């Protein structure tokens, strides 16, 4: 079975280094002229799939914006996932789950088991209970060709108080996460399947992110304040592994399909220039 790292590497080579989020929050639904209900949610998601599903390497639905409508919202999420995969995009479900034992194993089955209606290519997870507690998620990903993105250095300013705190051994909490994920990805070619979430807004990290040997999801671009040019400052020699993530910067162009595509093309061009220097 082909690994997620290999599939992501190929998707980026074919479609370019870009992840676009699907974040149907009330303000954006209103901007699109849609009601803040499950029907508006469905129209929003279907439009994004139509516009971007066959041209963007990775699409990242934010699960919370679907879950807030209960079972009907989750049904829309299931449909969105199916449509995106049929269109050829890799689906990264933003859930930021984190737990222990049988519970994290259940999360792994929900998102990474091919028979699940919520089966996606990769998920985001939180390491606050310890990176080792996420082992069932990593194991399922390895067995089923899935991917996992672990929060490390996030774009929200509140994160620094925890992530840059130092452990008894002198390493920052973020460095502990980086080191453990680096070990998981050791020797993987062309890219490991366990990635990190590293915000594009955080400036120089002081960490060797190239050693991770896995994909580096970079949120915080566009509406959150970072530009594609900031990627060079944050990631340095790790630029080849960076997957820039935009949401509002692209989605604000909707609901017109052509405008959404043009917005995605524009930020992709910015990302290519920043990542390659051309």
UniProtKB/Swiss-Prot annotation:
Family designation: Belongs to the OMP decarboxylase family. Type 2 subfamily.
Enzyme Commission number(s): 4.1.1.23
Pathway of action: Pyrimidine metabolism; UMP biosynthesis via de novo pathway; UMP from orotate: step 2/2
Name used for this protein in its record: Orotidine 5'-phosphate decarboxylase
Catalytic residues in the record: 96
Domain of life, source organism: Bacteria
UniProt-recorded Gene Ontology molecular function terms: orotidine-5'-phosphate decarboxylase activity
Lineage of origin: Bacteria, Bacillati, Actinomycetota, Actinomycetes, Micromonosporales
Secretion signal, residue range per the UniProt entry: none
PROSITE patterns in the record: OMPDECASE (PS00156)
Keywords: Decarboxylase, Lyase, Pyrimidine biosynthesis
Organism: Salinispora arenicola (strain CNS-205)
SMART domains given in the database record: OMPdecase (SM00934)
Annotated InterPro entries: Aldolase_TIM, OMPdecase_AS, OMPdecase_type-2, OMPdeCOase_dom, RibuloseP-bd_barrel
Catalysis: reaction(s): orotidine 5'-phosphate + H(+) = UMP + CO2
CDD domains: OMP_decarboxylase_like (cd04725)
HAMAP family: OMPdecase_type2
GO biological process, one term: 'de novo' pyrimidine nucleobase biosynthetic process
């Amino acid at each position: 079975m082909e690994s997620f790292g290999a599939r992501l590497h190929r998707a980026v080579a074919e479609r370019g280094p870009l992840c676009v989020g699907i974040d149907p929050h009330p303000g954006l639904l209103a901007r699109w002229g849609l009601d803040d209900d499950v029907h508006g949610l469905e129209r929003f998601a279907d439009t994004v799939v139509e516009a971007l599903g066959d041209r963007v390497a990775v699409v990242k639905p934010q699960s919370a914006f679907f879950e807030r409508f209960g079972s009907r919202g989750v049904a829309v999420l299931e449909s969105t996932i199916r449509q995106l995969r049929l269109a050829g995009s890799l689906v990264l479900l933003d859930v930021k789950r984190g737990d222990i034992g049988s519970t994290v194993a259940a999360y792994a089955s929900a998102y990474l088991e091919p028979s699940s209606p919520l089966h996606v290519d990769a998920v985001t997870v939180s390491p606050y209970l310890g990176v080792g507690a996420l082992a069932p998620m990593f194991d399922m990903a390895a067995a089923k060709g899935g991917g996992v993105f672990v929060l490390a250095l996030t774009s929200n300013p509140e994160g620094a108080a925890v992530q840059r705190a130092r452990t008894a051994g002198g390493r920052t909490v973020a460095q502990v996460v980086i080191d453990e994920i680096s070990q998981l990805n050791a020797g993987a070619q062309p890219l490991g399947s366990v990635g990190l979430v590293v915000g594009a807004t955080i400036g120089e990290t002081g960490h060797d992110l190239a050693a991770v040997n896995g994909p580096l999801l970079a949120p915080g671009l566009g509406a959150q304040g970072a530009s594609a040019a900031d990627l060079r400052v944050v990631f340095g020699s790790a630029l080849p592994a960076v997957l820039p993530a935009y949401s509002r910067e692209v989605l604000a162009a909707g609901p017109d399909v052509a405008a959404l595509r043009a917005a995605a093309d524009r930020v992709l061009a910015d990302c290519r220039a920043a990542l390659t220097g051309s």
